[in-house]
Amino acid sequence: MFQDNPLLAQLKQQIQENLPKKEGTIKATEKGFGFLEVDSKTSFFIPPAYMKKCMHGDKVIAIIRTENEREVAEPQELVEQMLNRFIGRVKMFKGKLNVVPDHPQLKKMSLKAKTKKGLNPQEFAEGDWVVGHLIRHPLKDDNGFFVEISEKITDADDKIAPWWVTLAENDLPNSEPAGIDDWQIKDDADLERIDMTHIPFVTIDGESTKDMDDALYAKKNDAGDFELTIAIADPTAYITPDDEMDKVARERGFTIYLPGRNIPMLPRDLADELCSLIEGEIRPALCCTVTVSKDGVIGDDIQFFAANIKSHARLAYDNVSDWLETGSCEKWQPSEEIAAIVRDLYEFSQARAEWREKNAVVFPDRPDYRFELSEDNDVVAIHADMRRSANRLVEESMITANICAGKTLQAHFGTGVFNCHAGFKPEKIADVVELVNPEGTLEFTAESIATREGFAALRRWLSKQETTYLDNRIRKFQTYSEVSNQPLPHYAMGLDIYATWTSPIRKYGDMINHRMLKALILNKEPVQKPDDSVGEELALHRKHHKIAERNVADWLYARTLADAPENQTLFTGEIFDINRAGMRIRLLENGAAAFIPGSLIIDNKERIECNGDLGTVSIDKEVVYKLGDVLEVVLADVNQENRSLVAKPTQVFAELPVVEETQN
């Protein structure tokens, strides 16, 4: 009788129009109900029936009404849906295709699905990994959620899943770009390449490295200063800005480095063969020579030139480090000529490191965690590789080369691709001073730490403190590193200028800088200058690559450490973040991140306080943990679905003594 009654519908609409409305974000719970979060302090309850119209993360407008003496929100209008393109797993329901999103808050949702035109639904099985697109939403078109599957990523039980799924999730390629049959050198007709094949350059890389993009040569002169030559692989000899391959390189931005594998920015036949500075092979290169004083000061005699070079020795980090640190190496005995070059390079690197420690900023040594995989993509071991003498030798050479490029590009063009860092966020400078100089007895003032010199001096002072507590606190007040086409300083490195050109096989920005440096050599206008958007593009690529690297690592850690809770394996954890729910630690044995909830420190909310602002955990108002502390832990839970680790300190905090009431 009342069905489709226009008067009733009109009355209902009028009532709804008079009810208050709020815009907010949906927060789902595991129990079916949810909340509309309007801001950090305001939220409204959403009953299970209303939650069926939306999903976690949706931004909606909801009407607020009172039901059973409680204010509730009923989502009415979709502002922005949380899911668009997403990764999920196939779930068969009564023989019909469904997709479960691979998202911690959405894993209980099974969404009806179809395959896009050209895909055979019969080829999909339970648990397969797919790319889905949410094409229907209840708040948009009065129908249930509906998904179109555009791509199958891999089978349910494929061990390659962590890599392929993560790359698909971030919309990144999972293979190298296609090469061409006949690469030709396309140098400017006026570019002269100096024959330097007689100069005994050496490459120092990892044992398995194929894309060797830098070769080094140093000679100590009679005054004790170092004449350094850096030769860098030259892919822009083969690729012009108008080539299709240049567009591909720009779209990729960087070679993607994931645990156990990489996805090159350029085709492997170029990166690993034609451009790679392979021992005994003549290669085109872009070179820089500079004199560095015995005190580590970079001279004004910086020169860039094009050359043909030949690596005279392919060396490995560990072998060179063993030889430098102990005087011998079982696996490698250098000729007198190569030994002299390596020794001079090492002495140069020590002079530069000493200069940077006094005048700039040297980052603390932390291990590089490396996953060793079997042919079946199982983790065989996780190695903590410390940076050794040879690593530092190459690092100092590259930093020197990039300072030279920065100075040159700034002086001649006033533009280029520069790595920059602005120091502290302006609005946080007063907080930094209050933290490090509360009594006003130190040299650090709001004015001084706003300068590059003052920022670097503060970082050097922090590195000498007994604990890393202040260093960890202050990191939150820093800006992020950026890529810019303007010559801006790099506060975090303590340098006036920094422009990378030493990895053009792996970084598109370095290719641009190569073209500009060649223009300088030719005394012509550059064939390519960095536009205003290139910095943001490269930063976005870098962000997605970092997320992908972390996600693959988290997945592999969860697989590898699955038995650790049962075995009660002991780990050493370093606290790197504290919030009101608990603290986050890095396991020093393998690099995995784990969360320690407050309840696993002590199961009494009244006694514990986790203070994110101060970076401390207190029990009974006494600080027991702070940022930078190292503690012994066991893993309490390894969640394979969320790829997350929960840890628990082995330290047990005593119960409060029970005070017995005395009878009068």
UniProtKB/Swiss-Prot annotation:
Q: Which reaction does it catalyse?
A: Exonucleolytic cleavage in the 3'- to 5'-direction to yield nucleoside 5'-phosphates
Q: Which residues does UniProt assign to the signal peptide?
A: none
Keywords, sorted A to Z: Cytoplasm, Exonuclease, Hydrolase, Nuclease, RNA-binding
Taking every annotated instance into account, which residue ranges of this chain make up the domain S1 motif? 568-650
Recorded superkingdom: Bacteria
Among the GO molecular function terms of this UniProt record, one is: RNA binding
Q: Which residues form the RNB domain?
A: 193-521
Against Pfam families, the record matches this protein to: OB_RNB, RNB, S1
Q: Name one GO biological process term.
A: mRNA catabolic process
Please give the PROSITE patterns that the UniProt record associates with this protein.
RIBONUCLEASE_II, S1
Q: What is its EC number?
A: 3.1.13.1
For the protein in the UniProt heading, the enzyme class is hydrolase
SS bond partners: none
Which InterPro entries does this one have?
CSD, NA-bd_OB-fold, RNase_B_OB_dom, RNase_II, RNase_II/R, RNase_II/R_CS, RNase_II/RNase_R, RNR_Ribonuclease
Locations listed in the record? Cytoplasm
Question: What SUPFAM superfamilies would the database entry show?
Answer: Nucleic acid-binding proteins (SSF50249)
GO-annotated cellular components:
cytosol
User: Sorted alphabetically, which PANTHER family does this protein's record hold?
Assistant: EXORIBONUCLEASE 2, RIBONUCLEASE
Q: Show the HAMAP family listed in the entry.
A: RNase_II
Question: Any idea what job this protein has?
Answer: Involved in mRNA degradation. Hydrolyzes single-stranded polyribonucleotides processively in the 3' to 5' direction.
Tell me its family. Answer: Belongs to the RNR ribonuclease family. RNase II subfamily.
Q: What is this protein called?
A: Exoribonuclease 2
Q: Which species?
A: Vibrio vulnificus (strain YJ016)
In the record, what lineage is assigned to the organism producing the protein?
Bacteria, Pseudomonadati, Pseudomonadota, Gammaproteobacteria, Vibrionales
